[in-house]
């Protein structure tokens, strides 16, 4: 099993005079949706596709709800989801307001077993 990559040319953001360099950029081999995940999980167990799909849907909703409460969602050896923000700065601590949060991003940190799978990926040029 391998992951393919293309070569892309990029400059340094904010520094147009810096020479551009070439970098590998992963090429997706396809997409897997919730139904595909549910079907695959059902094939690996004694649970029906419909029941598995319902569990997957609930699971995804719970992750979003817990993140919206400000919680880190730890899923054992799979990893953790947490929120990060993009913000605008203020000159003084007293003048910091919620309106300075310009974007909320979801981050994922893989757990040990997940990372071990990632470490086995073989890359090849597309």
Predicted region positions:
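Strongly charged
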Residues: 1-126
């Amino acid at each position: 099993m391998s992951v393919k990559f293309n070569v892309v040319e990029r400059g340094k953001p904010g520094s147009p005079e810096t020479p551009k360099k070439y970098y590998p950029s992963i090429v997706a081999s396809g997409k897997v949706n919730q139904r595909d995940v549910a079907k695959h999980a059902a094939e690996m167990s004694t649970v029906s596709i419909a029941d598995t799909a319902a569990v997957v849907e609930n699971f995804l909703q719970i992750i979003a709800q817990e993140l919206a409460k400000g919680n880190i969602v730890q899923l054992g050896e799979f990893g953790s989801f947490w929120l990060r923000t993009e913000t605008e700065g203020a000159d003084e601590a007293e003048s910091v307001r919620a309106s300075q949060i310009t974007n909320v991003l979801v981050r994922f940190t893989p757990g040990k077993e997940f990372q071990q799978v990632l470490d086995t990926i073989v890359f090849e040029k597309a």
